[in-house]
Amino acid sequence: MGSIFKDGRRILVRPKSLIICLCLISIIFTQLIRYQYQLIADEVQPTINEDHSSSQSLKNTKLNSTRSSSPISPPKSLNKLTSQEFWEHIFNIFEINKFDDGLKPLIKYTPKEQQLTTKIKTRDWLLSKANIFHKDIIRQYHESVLRNLPSKLPKSVYTPNTYGIVTIGGNFYSWMAYIQLLQLRKLGSNLPVEILIPSIEDYYKEAHFCDHVLPQYNAKCILVPEKLGFNVAKHWKFSSYQFKALALCLSSFQHVLILDSDNVVLSKPEKVFDSPVYRDNGMVLWPDYWERTISPEWYDIIGKPVVGNKQVRTGRFPVNIHNMLTSELEINETRFHDLEGALPDLSTESGQVMFNKKTHGKVMLMTLYYNIFGPEIYYKLFSLGALGEGDKDTFAAAALACGEKYYQVASSIRTLGYFDTTPGGGFHGMAMAQKNPQLDYQLFQKTNQNFKDLHLDWDNEAKDQFSANNKIPIFTMHCNIKKINPAAYMKDEKIANMDEKRMNVRFYSNLKFKLNDDDIYSPDNEKEKNKSEKTDNDPNEIDFELSRWQIVSEILCDQKITFQFLKDENMDEVCQFVKNTIAWLGKKT
């Protein structure tokens, strides 16, 4: 016999009845938990519900046209906030400074026929690209956010003195993230990895992958709703580039390398974390192909206008003999981003970013702000319609707004791809190879100091050291075109041999890399340069493409992990295609 209490009375219950009662209680509790998660999984627009009682800290306290100058304080001191309480406070700052629908659109591109067509991206050229409305209100909201965001992060947000990699998962992105992870382990890197899963629904579909597969490789999934907290996840809807900023914010590491899922590293990140380029700067970025197209009006919005009379660089290279622009004609013939106070060229390619949360905590929060409100204003304000609109320049912009330093690699992207030999074909760029940041930094510092000592500007020979085909080894391979999918490749007659059921082209220019190649070449040792050249039959040399397909075979054909995007495919046929491709690539090496 057992007993329970009902209406204050003790009632005897038979064991069988007690078991039934306990089962019912367990079922009810489980359903309540599932219901709570379902609330998070439902798509809810990023607006506040009419019923504000469940999320008092997110209630709409906006004024009609101004923002209160009083500080937006957390419910208790920052160091006493839990991680979820901290993010609720941060998103409350965003909510209070959200743009009313009546103000939109905040920015509108100018018709092509009204834009200036000069080749040089001058101030006037940039200003001709878009009209920005309600600038005083945008400035006021920006100032309010910048003033209220904390300068340092509480320890509940990250674990001090930890290093790791974070990337984005969910369906196809989990597949690419897993390839990235196995490539990392092939290099011998043991850095922990966290994969951001956007929703509870995504997690349900990949629970086995998250809970059983990843832990074998010192990796795990982190869920946006669990990290942000239920109130924030319920009231804000995230998409696209915003997840990268969230991945940075929600990762547990102090020192973070954030990678796009289709990006892989070719040398151990541990060495870069432990190098001067990272220690000196706290944030490391890499270049895109194009010059920056950030609107001059953004500099006014953040309270750091570019006056426009002192040229301090030509592109990404410093000018040691400063050119004072004394006439309107000179100003109109000078690139805006060559002027003192502007962010230097080139634009940023954000497929990889290195970040120290202790030194750049506020930069991280401002990066998040620019991405949360990116679709409404900042993506367009930073790109002005140029290629690559998105999160890429939000990192450098946040650093300037917060007054923090960073280093952007000077070496140009090396584009890898293949030539289409069919009539009308040409070169197909398939991947962006970014260079080792420490060796780039070392060479840049040395070269610039030499020219400073001589009181001269950089000559073309010096600039050529940072060309796409320089000696500095590749650090990451951002394989962003035709993202790897053997089930799709085998049906594409442009790239597959349909008779032999294998690939018919190499995507990555026969790229080979050496393990620990960053130890081989140093710009301080000219005699060592030749050692970084490719040699035949080098046992330490790895065929990048062959290695990539071997990882695909391991995942799909050995481990037999089936991701959602492959659930309707004939995996026997897919695996045969993979094996045939590996055999073909092996003959080519």
From Swiss-Prot:
Keyword Nucleotide-binding found: no
Listed pathway(s): Protein modification; protein glycosylation
Keyword Ribosomal protein: no
GO annotation, biological process: mannan biosynthetic process; protein mannosylation
Transmembrane segments: 17-33
Annotated stretches, region: Disordered: 50-77
Subcellular location: Golgi apparatus membrane
Protein name: Alpha-1,2-mannosyltransferase MNN22
Natural source organism: Candida albicans (strain SC5314 / ATCC MYA-2876)
Upper lineage: Eukaryota, Fungi, Dikarya, Ascomycota, Saccharomycotina
